[in-house]
Amino acid sequence: MNRRFGLLLISIACMVLFPFRAPAPLFYVPGEGWYYESYGKNVKWQRPRAKEQLDVAEQAFYKSDYTTALRAAHRVLRVWPLSDYAPDAEYFIGRCLEAKGKDEAAFKAYQNIIEKYPRSSRYEDVLWRQYAIANRFLGGEWFRIWGTIPLYSSMDQTAGMFNKIVNNGPYSDVAPHAQLRIGAAREKQKNFPTR
């Protein structure tokens, strides 16, 4: 009993005598909510207008600071969802997620552009980016559970991705290529009737 008490007393003394800095990097912005900012990072990424905020996201993306670019682009969508800059913000979200290796989330971000902003100037580029992502899954990239843990490779889901591409742009340049890849995914699936 005395030994346990002595160890507890020593550990408490170490905590009191050798404290470490533990800043609370959570910030609250009225109307936006809470966000986490790593200690020592520059928090000067917020701007009062959508165009300026999108410029911050674009500059951060080209500097390969994908975390800041994601935050800035998400802020454009959260604060100014009906802005003319919202499709470009969604596009940069997809590009950042793709650069971080989160291909499923990037595909969904690109799908949001197609569904929410069908007249976007980046429509054709988005279709080709979705096609490239689906090709990576066709090549054997694994789908992830909770966006982090690689779990399985599914040709059925890959064929579904190519099918979405065909449905998004049936008369686009990418549609015939995607239709051929649907067949390739089904062939790799090896779950078809033989005669």
Predicted regions and their residues:
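Bacterial N-terminal signal peptides that target proteins for export
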Residues: 1-9
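Aromatic (phenylalanine/tyrosine) cluster motif
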Residues: 5, 18-20
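Bacterial N-terminal signal peptides
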Residues: 9-17
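Acidic, polar-rich low-complexity tracts and alpha-helical solenoid repeat scaffolds
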Residues: 20-195
